[in-house]
Amino acid sequence: MRVWVDADACPNMIKEVLFRAAQRRKVQVTLVANQPLKVIPSPFIKAIQVSAGFDVADNYIVEQVEAGDLIITADIPLAAEAIEKGGLVISPRGELLTAENIRPRLNMRDFLEQMRSSGEHTGGPAALTANDKQAFANALDRLITKGLKDS
């Protein structure tokens, strides 16, 4: 199992959880972004900087993902593509995104996109809380444990 992180918008507190998990569980974590990333020195953690551009990092992740890999993202279209390839997806809030629950999220995203394009202000997601961080850490641990057991 490899862990892929859509790192452009990944909060630092979530990256810290990922770094600790990579070290403790000896799992390969790869952060992908179109800007330089700071990562701790570790044989289990690497950062890949892709060229700037719309969805370049997302497309790179989708190309690399294999069935059973874990993807960390809040990007719903990226999550949908990763799920189609057999990836497991959790959001930075610890929500497990699946084939069963991704379609309604895609529909809501598209609806909000239409609202924004018509000039409606829809706001953004709430700031991450300590509870979100804990939910993420718990979900990450569960999925890594399952992934290591299955491999």
Swiss-Prot record:
Transmembrane segments: none annotated. It comes from the Bacteria. InterPro entries: UPF0178. NCBIfam families: PRK00124.1. Belongs to the UPF0178 family. HAMAP family: UPF0178. This is UPF0178 protein Sde_3033.
